[in-house]
Swiss-Prot record:
The cytochrome bc1 complex contains 11 subunits: 3 respiratory subunits (MT-CYB, CYC1 and UQCRFS1), 2 core proteins (UQCRC1 and UQCRC2) and 6 low-molecular weight proteins (UQCRH/QCR6, UQCRB/QCR7, UQCRQ/QCR8, UQCR10/QCR9, UQCR11/QCR10 and a cleavage product of UQCRFS1). This cytochrome bc1 complex then forms a dimer. InterPro entries: Cyt_b/b6_C, Cyt_b/b6_C_sf, Cyt_b/b6_N, Cytb/b6-like_sf, Cytochrome_b, Cytochrome_b_C_euk/bac, Cytochrome_b_N_euk/bac, Di-haem_cyt_TM. PROSITE patterns: CYTB_CTER, CYTB_NTER. It comes from Micoureus regina (Short-furred woolly mouse opossum). Component of the ubiquinol-cytochrome c reductase complex (complex III or cytochrome b-c1 complex) that is part of the mitochondrial respiratory chain. The b-c1 complex mediates electron transfer from ubiquinol to cytochrome c. Contributes to the generation of a proton gradient across the mitochondrial membrane that is then used for ATP synthesis. This is Cytochrome b.
Length: 382
């Protein structure tokens, strides 16, 4: 068995990735979220597959097909609730995973980081097209508002929007193609995950100190397999509690009403995991400016490795940068709250200030703090 594990072409890859992989001995629970994201992806693909067997991507029957899944299909309600809340768990793990990368300087593995940013964008695109499929009020109007943002692109904007819609409004063609995208994108995500892991295993994992861990490595199995199993059980407990006891907690009540192009909901807003970006979009009273700020809010992650001016990798021994990091976290929570509020005072000004602070912390304050901490650590003899 040992020989097969180490010699068989496929088993050898699995062995080098999950069994005999040398891992730093001191990685904390913040390193669990990568494996949790893998589990989330598998859960989403499996539940999504079973939903796709019963769903119809037609404007006349989409809403009732979802109702049919919840009422008539064996455990359809559970599969649907797991899929909807699984998306929330996915994004929760994603945000923590990215936050961990920023805190401990994992972004200095540039290839891994850049593939990670592409993965984040792909997952966001998948979640957006998936939200349109139940064809409720918020599905329809969310699709209308967000796709309409592309009309801000000079010259080709309106043509591009109509091309994506497949007509002059969000209709049957739009729903059908969004279902096709929602089906194919998770498999593209799986391929990107493979590339992400390939680049990660070229360098090995980072660790909380940010120092070179080569002097003290342990095998991934059994140490981290058992640790990941514990993380999975905790996440599964939270997911199942959410899906069983309050499945509609994170959803929008408007989505219980079938899509109606003649009736606009009073407050159009996306799912909670997009609210921070939505708040940044709304904080600029100009269409093109808002779209650019929305893109920048995610794409700013790509330039983070270039903004690393400190001699230390991790924030573990950098108290000023730590304060800024947690200020950024609080700021993102504020933006999430603002994104769900109506466009009126005082929410407008709070959103604008939080948006400015978001970019200021990442682009200006954190690099400055890194330089300042280096300066404080320099020995100064009289």
């Amino acid at each position: 068995m040992t020989n097969m594990r180490k010699n068989h072409p496929i088993m050898k890859i699995i062995n080098h990735s999950f069994i005999d992989l040398p891992a730093p001995s001191n990685i904390s629970s913040w390193w669990n979220f990568g494996s949790l994201l893998g589990i989330c992806l598998i859960i989403q693909i499996l539940t999504g597959l079973f939903l796709a067997m019963h769903y119809t991507s037609d404007t006349l029957t989409a809403f009732s097909s979802v109702a049919h899944i919840c009422r008539d299909v064996n455990y359809g309600w559970l599969i649907r609730n797991m899929h909807a809340n699984g998306a929330s768990m996915f994004f929760m793990c994603l945000f923590i995973h990215v936050g961990r990368g920023i805190y401990y300087g994992s972004y200095l593995f540039k290839e891994t980081w850049n593939i990670g940013v592409i993965l984040l964008l792909t997952v966001m695109a998948t979640a957006f097209v998936g939200y349109v499929l139940p064809w409720g009020q918020m599905s329809f109007w969310g699709a209308t508002v967000i796709t309409n943002l592309l009309s801000a692109i000079p010259y080709i904007g309106n043509t591009l929007v109509e091309w994506i819609w497949g007509g002059f409004s969000v209709d049957k063609a739009t729903l059908t193609r969004f279902f096709a995208f929602h089906f194919i994108l998770p498999f593209i995500i799986m391929a990107l995950v493979m590339v992400h892991l390939l680049f990660l295993h070229e360098t090995g994992s980072n660790n909380p100190t940010g120092l070179n861990p080569d002097s003290d490595k342990i095998p991934f199995h059994p140490y981290y397999t058992i640790k990941d199993a514990l993380g999975f059980m905790l996440m599964f407990l939270i997911l199942m509690s959410l899906a069983m006891f309050s499945p509609d907690l994170l959803g929008d009540p408007d989505n219980f009403t079938p899509a109606n192009p003649l009736n606009t909901p009073p407050h159009i807003k996306p799912e909670w995991y997009f609210l921070f970006a939505y708040a940044i979009l709304r904080s600029i009273p100009n269409k093109l400016g808002g779209v650019l700020a929305l893109l920048a809010s995610i794409l700013v992650l790509i330039i983070i490795p270039l903004l690393h001016l400190s001699k230390q990798r991790s924030l573990m021994f950098r108290p000023i940068s730590q304060i800024l990091f947690w200020l950024l976290t609080a700021n993102l929570l504020t933006l999430t709250w603002i994104g769900g509020q109506p466009v009126e005072q005082p929410f407008i000004i709070i959103g604008q200030l939080a948006s400015i602070l978001y970019f200021t912390i990442i682009i200006i304050l954190m690099p400055l703090a890194g330089m300042m901490e280096d300066n404080l650590l320099e020995p100064k003899f009289p």
